Amino acid sequence: MVICLHCPDQDDSLEEVTEECYSPPTLQNLAIQSLLRDEALAISALTDLPQSLFPVIFEEAFTDGYIGILKAMIPVWPFPYLSLGKQINNCNLETLKAMLEGLDILLAQKVQTSRCKLRVINWREDDLKIWAGSHEGEGLPDFRTEKQPIENSAGCEVKKELKVTTEVLRMKGRLDESTTYLLQWAQQRKDSIHLFCRKLLIEGLTKASVIEIFKTVHADCIQELILRCICIEELAFLNPYLKLMKSLFTLTLDHIIGTFSLGDSEKLDEETIFSLISQLPTLHCLQKLYVNDVPFIKGNLKEYLRCLKKPLETLCISNCDLSQSDLDCLPYCLNICELKHLHISDIYLCDLLLEPLGFLLERVGDTLKTLELDSCCIVDFQFSALLPALSQCSHLREVTFYDNDVSLPFLKQLLHHTALLSQLIYECYPAPLECYDDSGVILTHRLESFCPELLDILRAKRQLHSVSFQTTKCSKCGGCYIYDRHTQCCRFVELL
């Protein structure tokens, strides 16, 4: 238990007084607002409207809910690309319906107007605001394509197809009204509409909703999947869909529990858990794996990593229990031998031997760029097993080791090794045990007296960028003290 005797109710140093500056609307803004208030006039003006005004007027109409104008703008959009950006967070059901009705009008056109160039509509948050691409086809997936009819076929027409891309579908237990409407709309037009979702979040699980999603969404285009607050047997239910995700790049398993969700509260036995995990399909393209609060990963980490086809770039494990066998398998897993980012945090490691982790660092020494070993209760002798390999990780850019139990002499030894890593631009080290009294009270004056010498160890070998020393979080307020080379003093930070 760590206690801070100076727990401020708020950190006054972080308060900033800001003044709101009022900017009067420009003549253009006033003209646009006046135009939008007359829907009939606004719609009739679209054919002669300068292209440069389309994004501005669309954003105003979207924000203020002029759904009739939105509907009319889609079929005459003069750019190949339309991204809603952050505005998608404010998209209600009526606005969504208006935009989809505009797409229906576009699909129904037998002759494409010379003005409309729309090929991609993007319900993603890539951009801060509504944006219209000006480079036709450059780096963009086709949104509107035309399949040419068979030559000399009687009564044949050009078949139009649309691709609609959305950033994320969030399924929290049951589908919300807007998502349900979008899926049904796309399903009813499945011959001409292809709905692509780059990111899928499933929080809780209604099997009927999952089945409904994959009737419409192209699973092979999902690049990021987040599974949160589901049971392990429900994870097994998703296996057939995981097999279809040929482009899955990032997988997050967050709070996957080992009990049945439908009335049976008994914990699964180890044999059943192993059987369910072993059924996970091969993930051919996965590059990033995040595992948080998954209790049954203990003793089964090797089975999880077995599913990987390509070498991982990022492995992040937090709030889990690991066994010695889990650590022992790491150096011998070929699919993590090219890691660029290794993050292990909030895992109790003080009872384990870390030599296997040192062997892993040796294997990834030529590729590793970030290393996080935070809040793992690692003590001096365990850290010592990592030092020889750590100093050979010459491409490291970031290291964080805060909230571990190291002494001042060992911390100096650690710094002598990281001082050899010339590419480091961000470093966060734990405050040594000597910065706490026997009751766990943080002694900031000691940290302030130790840190100049600690910084000198690094400064003697290389140029410093961002270097800090951080205490363990206070058990009362959750804050901590940080000493960094820029302020050269301890400052209180309230951690979220």
UniProtKB/Swiss-Prot annotation:
Entry function: May down-regulate the expression of spermatogenesis-associated genes in female germ cells allowing their normal differentiation into oocytes. May act as a Ras-mediated signaling protein in early embryogenesis.
Cellular compartments per GO CC: cytoplasm; nucleus
Subcellular location, record wording: Nucleus; Cytoplasm
Tissue expression: Expressed in the ovary, ovulated oocytes and preimplantation embryos (at protein level). Not detected in testis, liver, kidney, spleen, heart, lung and brain.
Organism: Mus musculus (Mouse)
Protein name per its UniProtKB record: Oogenesin-1
Keywords: Cytoplasm, Leucine-rich repeat, Nucleus, Repeat
Subunit and interaction comment: Interacts with RALGDS (via Ras-associating domain). Interacts with HRAS (in GTP-bound form).
Major subcellular location class: nucleus
